[in-house]
């Protein structure tokens, strides 16, 4: 269902990987066709988008945790439902576990003496989200992700080449330059002025960015620079996270 062979792993300032050609072409083409319309009312602002005083996100989402219409949307999308069920499966957990171990990242120490499968079954869930960020200034401010997250996978679902080249549409992997933000496990939003970009990950078709939640897993998106041609376009992606119960 997914292919992790064409991957590159990084360790500084925290572990992350870039995987190209993650899906077979036929599957990816179907995902592009089936991606829900971001203008549909079934999409809702992220919680942080509603809290303007925080100013953390400017994005919309449809997910399996909080969106009431998620099951109605996905049940009529054959390929999307197929990959959703795959990402929720133990097979996916095992594939990711083996991938991490092969790249010297071991999160098995969390399990103590319990069965690995039982440990994940009882203690973790998989979060699945259709994400949409407006291309006319949309952004995700620097943050390290919720303490409940263990692993995050971001997969662009795009079919327009011009979106990939927009300034700010990729993901910036960051390092805090202000010492008070160096330890940020609880996911405090960090001013861009207090960060330094370590690596910029282009937002490319059929690619996956995967990173491990740490106290310093700082990253951001945008603000995406708009043009007269992109005001109605969206940065569409599927996000999959392994999260603590």
Predicted regions located by residue number:
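Non-heme Fe(II)/2-oxoglutarate
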Residues: 6-103
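N- or domain-start disorder-to-order transition segments that initiate the globular core
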Residues: 1-5
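Catalytic core of non-heme Fe(II) oxygenases with the double-stranded beta-helix
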Residues: 82-85, 92-245
